[in-house]
UniProtKB/Swiss-Prot annotation:
Binds 1 Fe(2+) cation per monomer. The record marks E96 as: May play a role in metal incorporation in vivo. Gene3D superfamilies: Jelly Rolls (2.60.120.10). Disulfide bonds: none annotated. The keyword Amino-acid biosynthesis applies. The record marks R105 as: Important to generate the dianion. This is Acireductone dioxygenase. Ni(2+) binds at H97, H99, E103, H141.
Amino acid sequence: MSRLRIFDDHTPNTPFFVSKEQAQITAELHKIGITFERWEATQAIEPGATAEQVMAAYRADIDRLIATHGFKTVDVISIAPDNAKREEMRAKFLEEHFHKEDEVRFFVAGSGLFTVHSGNKVYEIECVKNDLIAIPDGTLHWFDMGAAPYFVAIRFFTEPDGWVGHFTGTDIAQRFPRYIPEGCQSAH
């Protein structure tokens, strides 16, 4: 289940807002310019599915976003717990950074944790299957796929180069809890 926790940026262990309600999550994220919505697949997708199978399952939604936002590149990332490069991949996204284009991800399977630093607040967004998140360009954030990552996501880009992060060099991401999927422990 999707979850949003909001913290003051100086209290990484004490959220002042927690919700698993879709409407509340969407409303809170809308306040900082983030789009959060749910999609439904026309067929089941699991890690290991081809990019073509994944995109075919969501073709209508993909085409709608391309037409609305002018995305030039769409790809699929699929990572399972046995991926030999999982630690390297996790580390790449785990530091605070921003992009010069919107970061748009749709979770086809599995889960991951996007954390957004906006003003003096930190928004921890657990994205799960069927969640679409769109983080505006220039927004400070990081992503944690967890120590045993399991997700398939469709990624949308306006730039042909794909994912390009601009890192801030701050340690804020290190001060906040690491992602442990909800089913893996009783409390986050």
